[in-house]
Regions:
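Sec-dependent bacterial lipoprotein signal peptides
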Residues: 1-24
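Bacterial Sec signal peptide processing site at the extreme N-terminus
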Residues: 17-38
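N-terminal topogenic membrane-targeting module
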Residues: 36-46
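Short, isolated positions in well-ordered beta-strands
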Residues: 39, 49-52, 96, 134
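Short, surface-exposed binding/anchoring microloops in extracellular/periplasmic proteins
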Residues: 47-87
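Intrinsically disordered, low-complexity segments enriched in glycine and mixed charged residues
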Residues: 89-91
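Short, solvent-exposed, Trp/other aromatic-anchored flexible loops in extracytoplasmic proteins
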Residues: 93-149
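Short beta-strand elements
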Residues: 132-177
């Protein structure tokens, strides 16, 4: 009888640990969504800012990049390129001029010793899209975004995918814990 009770308790503990134990994972970044800006550029490219530690909300910006998205006739825009060698950034009233990376798609403020966080305004200037057109990007204020997922760490350790998206959007609109 005692062995049966121990087995029953062990089974109940295992069931609760697989079904009831969830952890939240939060990943932070900076983005510009098409709805954030009324300009024409958002049809052709997106802008993304990576942090030095994407799991730390107060981490500085490591890089700001442009990337191609849907082209006007539903083809993927394959190439975007910054035309300026230096990009102007204004943060806390100071102006910085950052070199364009070798890929001609990003700037690396942290690598150049400049700490940027939310509130930085980036002046990209002109961008070439697919060697066909040149678009002027207006000044961009990057907005901090968060991607929250929940997962079961015990099941995850056993290669059982329990990951669920909880929220993805602007940090200031996130109402979770």
């Amino acid at each position: 009888m005692k062995k049966l009770l121990i087995k029953l308790v062990a089974v109940v503990i295992i069931i609760f640990s697989f079904t009831g134990c969830y952890a939240l994972s939060k990943k932070y970044s900076y983005k510009v969504n098409p709805s954030d800006n009324s300009s024409n550029f958002s049809k052709y490219m997106g802008i993304y800012g990576a942090l030095t530690d994407s799991y730390d909300k107060d981490s500085p910006i490591e890089s700001v990049s442009i990337y191609p998205i849907n082209f006007s006739n539903k083809k993927t825009s394959e190439k975007v390129e910054l035309l300026s060698n230096k990009i102007k950034v204004v943060y806390k009233g100071k102006e910085y001029y950052l070199k364009t990376a070798k890929n001609k798609r990003s700037i690396l403020p942290y690598e150049e010793g400049i700490i940027l966080k939310e509130g930085a305004i980036v002046y990209f200037g002109k961008v070439k899209v697919d060697d066909k057109m040149i678009i002027e990007i207006p000044p961009i204020r990057l907005k901090k975004f968060v991607h929250v997922t929940s997962y079961n760490p015990i099941a995850d350790g056993l290669n059982i995918d329990t990951t669920k998206d909880v929220y993805e959007g602007p940090l200031d609109e996130y109402k979770g814990r």
